[in-house]
Amino acid sequence: DDIRNTVSLDQVAAEQVGNETRVRSLTLNSMGGAASLSWNRKGVPVPKDGNRASIYKRLFIDGTPEEIARETKRLAHGHSILDDMRGQLKSLHSQLGASDRERMELMETSIREAEVLLKQEEAWIAKPKPKVQEPATIFSDKAGNWVDSQNRWYGLIRLALQTDSTRVIVFGIGEHNNQGVPDLEIGHHDASHHGKDPSKIEQFARYEEKDYQNFAGFLDQLTETKEPGGSLLDHTQVLLTSNLGDASAHASNNLPTFLAGGGYKHQGHLRFDEENNYPLSNLYLRIL
């Protein structure tokens, strides 16, 4: 079968609400490498950002007059490049066959999307950024271990949502080393590929337990952040899931899925039949 990536859930949401905030969406990743959880409508991965310090600066530190001038010049240059590309495509249009015209239409769509993003950046460039009490040093990338690092990520995500700097965030948690949880002897990846070895399963469970403790702390942060009409958690849909239901077997069925907040009437833990059940996409559509 011809299977290819298409648009991810977060980018569909960003299309609906991304124009209302300084940052259309954030694709964050603590796992390193080139992995991204976000994909545009052409199936191209959206670049991730794994640097908390640069994200903090982007969201909360105003640029100097010189920096703003350079950014304005960069955006103007971007418009100029797009204008040149549009002119070149127009001159080629009459010379192309049907299949090439289809490719050209994709390029024209990309140009229009880039133009929208440039205009959005221009609209925000001179507006003051929100001020937060937490200093940049709290979100230093020099965290002691993955547990500390993960909690710093959650704190930064909470600030981004609280200040309405963005309304769409994806955070890839990734694998961990054995630092941060006492008496762990093997890494997260090794433990996840346990092959039903009881000792590895026990260590894997301890990694998972710490992940969920950190996640629960993040939900507590959202609950404690009060807003008109409720808490930040009441006004935020938080989805935690995985691409694997059984990492040891690389099985992608029976995925663990956790939905919090958003004003839903949650019913606690729901276990569905592994064969006769509902598509996970039903939940995604409800979120949108």
Regions from the PLM with identified roles:
Residues 1-288:
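Ligand-binding pockets and gating/stacking loops
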